[in-house]
Amino acid sequence: MDDTPRTLADERRRLLQELEVERNQVWRNIEWCRIRDIDRAFAGEWSLRDIVGHLASHDAEVVSAFRDLREGRPVTYFDIPDLDRWNADHVERKRGIDFWSLLEQLRGSRAHLLEELDAVSDELLTDETSTQYRLLRSVIDHDRDHWHEIAAR
């Protein structure tokens, strides 16, 4: 990739557009679900409520990682020893929360993520070897994985 400011800005816009497209797919697929899907397991043991809570938790974890980077602290996001256990713990924590509140958490966590991304330079966000790029890519891929699960219900 040519590292001129114009191409870096273009690549940043492309990545942020991809992020937006994947999250819009999440929302679109949530909207197509029936009320009964909120608490009915259809993705393994997970219901729509569980997936929405999980996505909000994941966004919040990535926001924390971006803050850690910005503040010079080590990032532990990629070092979670038992990802299945982490996911199960976070899903369980959200199970008692009203579904509509979880949707608001999902909106809020994405807004916080976008704020953090605004603070990242084009160079870091578009460098495929940077932690910032890897974090952004993980969110894009994560949204894609889960909207596919919702769509397949």
Regions found by a protein language model. Give the residues of each.
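Long, hydrophobic N-terminal alpha-helical segment
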Residues: 8, 12-37
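Structural signal for well-ordered, non-membrane alpha-helices
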Residues: 23-34, 60-67, 107-121, 144-147
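Short, helix-capping/interhelical loops that line the mouth of catalytic, cofactor-
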Residues: 1-14, 62-108
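Alpha-helix C-capping/helix-to-loop hinge sites
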Residues: 36, 93-97, 120
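Short, contiguous alpha-helical
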Residues: 2-3, 36-85, 122-153
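Short amphipathic alpha-helical segments with heptad-repeat character
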Residues: 13-16, 20, 52, 56, ...
